[in-house]
Amino acid sequence: MAPRPRFDRRAPVRELPNINDRINYPKLRVVDADGTQLGVISRDEALDVARERELDLVLVSEKADPPVCRIMDYGKFKFEQEKKAKEAKKKSHQTEVKEVKMRYKIDAHDYQVRIGQAVRFLKAGDKVKCTVIFRGREIQHTALAEKLLMRMAKDLEESAEVQQPPKREGRNMIMFLGPRKTPLQKDKPEQATKAERTLPIAKPPGKTAAPAAAN
C-alpha cells in the first residue's frame, strides 16, 4: 500500500524585512532621513550613521548597483505602508447591487432582519435594491408597498440615501438606496421622528382579548 501523503501543517515562514544587520551587501548607496544623498559607503558606515540618528537602515532597491538603502524609522514606515495598502484596497472595492426582498405584509421581526441586511450591504459600500414582491391580487396594494419602502428609507437614513424612489417594476415595487456620503442633519428630536413613523406591518396572529364584564 502506497504511503499516504503528509501535509506540512506548520505556519508559513514570514519573509523578514531587509533592515539593519540583515543587509549583507558590502557597499550601499545611502539616502539620509531628510533625503540627503550620502553617496556610496560601506555597510558598516551606513549602520553607524543609522545608529547615530537612532533610526533604521532599510534596503529600498536591491536590484540597483550598488543597492540603495534609506535611513528611516522603520516602524513608522511600515505603519504608513499598511495604511496606504488598506486605503488602496478600500478604493478598489467594486460597488455591487445587493437586493433585499420582502412582502408588503412583512411582520416586524422579518422587517428588522431586512434592515440589518441593508445596513451591512451599505457599510460595505454597496447599493441596495429594496424589492416588495406581489403575488396574485396583492398587486392592488401598491400604495402599502410604497409606504413600506419609504419607511425603510426613513429607518436607514443615517446609512443611506435614496437614489431611486419607489416605482413599479413588473409585478414588484422597487427602490434603490446608496451609501450616505454626507452626515445626516436632523431637524427634529429622535423621539419625535420615531413617533411620526408609521408602517403597514402585519401583526402576528393572536387571541383577541375578551371585553371586561360589566358590573
Swiss-Prot record:
UniProt keyword terms in alphabetical order: Cytoplasm, Initiation factor, Protein biosynthesis
A Pfam family per the record: IF3_N
Subcellular location per the Swiss-Prot or TrEMBL entry: Cytoplasm
GO biological process, one term: ribosome disassembly
Function: IF-3 binds to the 30S ribosomal subunit and shifts the equilibrium between 70S ribosomes and their 50S and 30S subunits in favor of the free subunits, thus enhancing the availability of 30S subunits on which protein synthesis initiation begins.
HAMAP family per UniProt: IF_3
Complexes and interactors: Monomer.
Protein name per Swiss-Prot or TrEMBL: Translation initiation factor IF-3
